[in-house]
């Protein structure tokens, strides 16, 4: 005994050492590991506390997992999907009542599955899905009542199935038909209901060779007339006790016949005329029979009288749906004999059953509430007999998804209302836009009328001013009043005009010297062009130097010419065509009524070119230079005639030379006209008469006057020499040969416009220096008149510069005298 005790101890120590060498389990499971952490076996049986779910701390390389004798209630796909190498799974003796469809789909290597002694009620196709290599399936000692015909379709390699000790009443003929490798099928200890519906399975079972030979334990339990019958008869009296032979003899196309001896015995509780099945044949007696009455074989064979009866099948409970709502249902249950058995309505959910209500009426309506849409609910009529539940009929209800509420469909009246509202809004917008357009158009017309009225008033006012200014000079018989102006230089010189007594006779008048009583002159041409108001100078751009200042002043002349271009053409043509007789005059004072421009004549070279006059500050130095054009021929220049934009009476002037100015030979001299005769009478042909006569003639010269001039560089001014000594007012008079000076020390250079100044904004009168912003219609007009006017103004300016460039000395003098009067008119 002592040796045996020591041997047992050594075995336990060796087992413990082996388990520790293989690796101790994580948690409460014992693991047997291999190389590189590979786990062969995990024993998690009889855990304390017992597992209620499959543990997840086990290595996913496990091959054999044993979880028997725990409290696992369900098998989920998520708990088994990580064990891809699992081959053997033992879940025996748990509380499993629900297996998720496809729970074993990740165990494609599983060969042995033990689910015995659990609480499964149904066996469906989804529970065994994916077990293509499964060979041994143990489902004994469960609560299985229904085995679907397609339950084993995905397990073609099954060899052994154990469905014993369950509650199976019916099996289909095709339940095991596809299992070609099946050798053992244990179905004993099930309460089979022997009827013609079981005949197909009985035929398969008779053809199947079961290796275990447990036919004596497979019996019918119901109906009571066939209780105790074996599914397959064996032994001495097996043929008579086999339900297969009995059903084959009585079942034809859904009905069956039975062997009866004597009148049929009524079955208690099922005594309905025409509906009770025939009773089973009586048990054979052991009494010996007479020799002449005994048939061959063992024992006495009773005489059996075969009678064919019209069998009546037993009425079974029925269920149908009466009404379905979004969360409830009403079912109708009909019971053939509610008092023969105890019927209840059971709900099956995940292999679990719940009693809904007891059925005590032949026909009842049961309302089922708190249901969910898109969920299958299974209800069965169950009867209890000898502690066993029998399913008579089942019904599956699935509440459909409630239809989505239809969107608001506008009625025809509403749609019409919307359409009319939209059309009304559009029509209203059209009316508003039309009204706005009408108002703006009316306002534009009013503005145009106002502009025309203002332009007419301005023209009338200008004409009135001209008449008021020059009218007395034309009509007065005597001397016209003189306009006061600033004195020029140290001595004031004036030119006093005399008007003729009669228009028919041309008389000679002598010029008297007025230097003894100095008078303020109206201003010479230089002052007229440079004596600008302060506000006009502020509106112009700042001038970087004197050459640009001279360019700007020449530009102002070009700007004014565009408005009176036709008048200039007529005037120039008239002045060029008139025949004037010039008489020598004594150099002396100039008229104070009009500003005088003194011109310089110098010897002509072989080639002449027109240059703009240059004004200088000093007396007698750097005076105004006048170069004649190429067409001009050398000769004595004529005296200038003054035209101020209005028709003047013909008049004569007498010039008296008061002194002689001596300058160096290289200096430029200003000579208007000199003659040894002391007095010279200047006769001027009336310009207005010639203007009217030569109006048509002027159009012939339009083309060459509108040609654009070339660019000529301005001649730089000469440095001013020191001013000479002058006498007082009572001394020597200012000679006409001396250049007129400006009262302010500022040089002005009149030069031709270069192309870079052609786009300058300029004008020669204050009212055109700063223009008001155009109105809204002028800004929005597609083809504005401003571009056209600017083009005409530029063309007119170029035409004037062309005329000035090619004009001869007397024509140039007439143009400058004319603009002297126009500038004086604007200044006034």
From Swiss-Prot:
Selectively expressed in perialvear somatostatin (Sst)-containing interneurons. One of its GO terms (biological process) is synapse organization. Its main location: membrane. The keyword Transmembrane helix applies. The keyword Ribosomal protein does not apply. Glycans are attached at residues 85, 90, 122, 210, 376. It is found in: Membrane; Cell projection, Dendrite. Residues 26-418 are extracellular. Interacts with PPP1CA. Postsynaptic protein that regulates circuit dynamics in the central nervous system by modulating the temporal dynamics of interneuron recruitment. Specifically present in excitatory synapses onto oriens-lacunosum molecular (OLM) interneurons and acts as a regulator of presynaptic release probability to direct the formation of highly facilitating pyramidal-OLM synapses. Inhibits phosphatase activity of protein phosphatase 1 (PP1) complexes. This is Protein ELFN1. The gene is Elfn1.
């Amino acid at each position: 005994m002592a040796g045996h005790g020591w041997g047992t101890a050594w075995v336990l120590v060796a087992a413990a050492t082996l388990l520790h060498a293989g690796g101790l389990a994580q948690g409460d499971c014992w693991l047997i590991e291999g190389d590189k952490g590979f786990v062969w076996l995990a024993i998690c049986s009889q855990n304390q506390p017992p597992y209620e779910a499959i543990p997840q701390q086990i290595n996913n390389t496990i091959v054999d997992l044993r979880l028997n004798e725990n409290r696992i209630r369900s098998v989920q796909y998520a708990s088994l999907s990580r064990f891809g190498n699992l081959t053997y799974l033992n879940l025996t003796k748990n509380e499993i009542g629900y297996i998720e469809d496809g729970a074993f789909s990740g165990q494609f290597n599983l060969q042995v599955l033990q689910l015995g002694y659990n609480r499964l009620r149904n066996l469906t196709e989804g529970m065994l899905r994916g077990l293509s290599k499964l060979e041994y399936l143990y489902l004994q000692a469960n609560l299985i009542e229904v085995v679907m015909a397609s339950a084993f379709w995905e397990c073609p390699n099954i060899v052994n199935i154990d469905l014993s000790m369950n509650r199976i009443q019916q099996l289909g003929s095709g339940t095991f038909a596809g299992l070609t490798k099946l050798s053992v099928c244990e179905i004993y200890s099930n309460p089979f209901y022997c009827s013609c519906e079981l005949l197909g399975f009985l035929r398969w079972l008779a053809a199947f060779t079961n290796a275990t030979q447990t036919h004596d334990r497979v019996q019918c339990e119901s109906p009571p007339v066939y209780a105790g019958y074996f599914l397959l008869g064996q032994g001495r009296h097996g043929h008579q006790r086999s339900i297969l032979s009995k059903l084959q003899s009585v079942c034809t196309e859904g009905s069956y016949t039975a062997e009866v001896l004597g009148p049929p015995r009524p079955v208690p509780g099922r005594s309905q005329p025409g509906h009770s099945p025939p009773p089973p044949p009586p048990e054979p007696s052991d009494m010996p029979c007479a020799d002449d009455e005994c048939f061959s074989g063992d024992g006495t064979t009773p005489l059996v009288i075969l009678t064919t009866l019209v069998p009546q099948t037993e009425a079974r409970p029925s269920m149908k749906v009466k009404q379905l709502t979004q969360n409830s249902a009403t079912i109708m249950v009909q019971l053939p004999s509610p008092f023969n058995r105890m019927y209840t309505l059971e709900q099956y959910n995940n292999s679990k059953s719940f009693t809904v209500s007891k059925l005590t009426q032949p026909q009842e309506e049961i309302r089922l509430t708190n249901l969910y849409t898109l969920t299958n609910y299974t209800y069965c009529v169950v009867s209890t007999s000898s502690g066993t539940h029998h399913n008579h009929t089942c019904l599956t209800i699935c509440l459909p998804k409630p239809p989505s509420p239809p969107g608001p469909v506008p009625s025809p009246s509403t749609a019409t209302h919307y359409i009319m509202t939209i059309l009304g809004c559009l029509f209203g917008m059209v009316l508003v836009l039309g009204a706005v357009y009408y108002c703006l158009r009316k306002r534009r017309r009013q503005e145009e009328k106002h502009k025309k009225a203002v332009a007419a008033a301005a023209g009338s006012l200008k004409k009135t001013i001209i008449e008021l200014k020059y009218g007395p000079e034309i009509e007065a018989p005597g001397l016209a009043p003189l306009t006061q102006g600033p004195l020029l230089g140290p001595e004031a010189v004036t030119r006093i005009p005399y008007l003729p007594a009669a228009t028919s006779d041309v008389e000679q008048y002598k010029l008297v010297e007025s230097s003894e009583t100095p008078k303020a002159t109206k201003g010479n041409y230089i002052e007229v062009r440079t004596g600008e108001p302060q506000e006009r100078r502020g509106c112009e751009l700042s001038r970087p130097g004197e050459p640009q200042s001279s360019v700007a002043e020449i530009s102002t002349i070009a700007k004014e010419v565009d408005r009176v271009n036709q008048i200039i053409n007529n005037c120039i043509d008239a002045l060029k065509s008139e025949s004037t007789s010039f008489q020598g005059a004594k150099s002396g004072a100039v008229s104070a009524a009009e500003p005088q421009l003194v011109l310089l004549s110098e010897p002509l070279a072989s080639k002449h070119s027109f240059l703009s006059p240059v004004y200088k500050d000093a007396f007698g130095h750097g005076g105004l230079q006048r170069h004649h054009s190429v067409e001009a021929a050398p000769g004595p220049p004529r005296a200038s005639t003054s035209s101020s934009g209005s028709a003047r009476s013909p008049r004569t002037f007498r010039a008296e030379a008061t002194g002689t100015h001596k300058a160096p030979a290289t200096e430029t001299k200003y000579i208007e006209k000199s003659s040894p005769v002391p007095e010279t009478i200047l006769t001027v042909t009336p310009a207005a008469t010639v203007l009217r006569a030569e109006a048509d003639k002027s159009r012939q010269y339009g083309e060459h006057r509108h040609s654009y001039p070339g660019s000529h560089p301005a001649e730089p001014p000469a440095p001013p020499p020191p001013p000479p000594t002058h006498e007082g007012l009572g001394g020597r008079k200012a000679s006409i040969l001396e250049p007129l000076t400006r009262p302010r020390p500022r040089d002005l250079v009149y030069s031709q416009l270069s192309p870079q100044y052609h786009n300058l904004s300029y004008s020669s009168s204050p009212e055109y220096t700063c223009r008001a912003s155009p109105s809204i219609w002028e800004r929005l007009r597609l083809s504005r008149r401003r571009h056209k006017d600017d083009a005409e103004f530029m063309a007119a300016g170029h035409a004037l510069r062309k005329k000035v460039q090619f004009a001869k000395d007397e024509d140039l003098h007439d143009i400058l005298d004319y603009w002297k009067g126009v500038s004086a008119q604007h200044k006034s």
